[in-house]
Curated annotation (Swiss-Prot):
InterPro entries: GreA/GreB_C_sf, TF_GreA/GreB_CS, Tscrpt_elong_fac_GreA, Tscrpt_elong_fac_GreA/B, Tscrpt_elong_fac_GreA/B_C, Tscrpt_elong_fac_GreA/B_fam, Tscrpt_elong_fac_GreA/B_N, Tscrpt_elong_fac_GreA/B_N_sf. Residues 1-75 form a coiled coil. It comes from the Bacteria. GO terms for molecular function: DNA binding; RNA polymerase binding. This is Transcription elongation factor GreA. Belongs to the GreA/GreB family. The gene is greA. GO terms for biological process: DNA-templated transcription elongation; regulation of DNA-templated transcription elongation. Keywords: Coiled coil, DNA-binding, Transcription, Transcription regulation. It comes from Mycoplasma mycoides subsp. mycoides SC (strain CCUG 32753 / NCTC 10114 / PG1). Necessary for efficient RNA polymerase transcription elongation past template-encoded arresting sites. The arresting sites in DNA have the property of trapping a certain fraction of elongating RNA polymerases that pass through, resulting in locked ternary complexes. Cleavage of the nascent transcript by cleavage factors such as GreA or GreB allows the resumption of elongation from the new 3'terminus. GreA releases sequences of 2 to 3 nucleotides.
Length: 157
């Protein structure tokens, strides 16, 4: 059986939008490029044709990948994540780190949605593993990294 892919509803919608774009815009454009390159004549030495075939293979692979992700998606209802008062996948968490004593905010998401530059942290990361299931005003140590540190959870949304 295939492994489930954990996604927020927003992440699922982004994948569906990407798939629609690939199917309705990108794939037809690549097919058009293939036809144009094919019309140039001799295919044995046609660099445009080779490039279009490579692009087609890339697009078809991405379409298949996105379809697989959508089909294996387990959507986390992040509207219910704060009802228990515990950190869960989909929670937005504010915390203070012992490294710099500054208030920071992250959202815990599935691994494929993770984007640390946007403060979207994978549920498989050391920080998420340490705080999932914890409540406000709990201090935890972030381990499994080269320099462990502590954080105190200030709010959960």
């Amino acid at each position: 059986m295939s492994k489930e892919i954990i996604l927020t509803q927003e992440g699922l919608e982004e994948l569906k939008a990407e798939l629609k774009h690939l199917l309705k815009v990108v794939r037809p454009k690549v097919i058009e490029e293939l036809v144009e390159a094919r019309n140039q004549g001799d295919l044995s030495e046609n660099a445009d044709y080779d490039a279009a075939r490579n692009r087609q293979a890339e697009v078809e692979a991405r379409i298949k990948e996105v379809e697989t992700l959508i089909n294996r998606a387990k959507v986390i209802d992040d509207s219910k994540t704060h009802s228990t008062g515990e950190v869960k996948i989909g929670s937005t968490v504010q915390f203070v780190s012992s490294l710099d004593n500054k208030l920071k905010e992250i959202k815990i998401v599935g691994a494929i949605e993770a984007d640390p530059f946007s403060n979207l942290i994978s549920n498989e990361s050391p920080i998420a593993k340490a705080i999932i299931g914890k409540k406000v005003n709990t201090t935890v140590e972030i381990k499994d990294i080269s320099k462990p540190y502590k954080i105190t959870i200030k709010s959960i949304k």
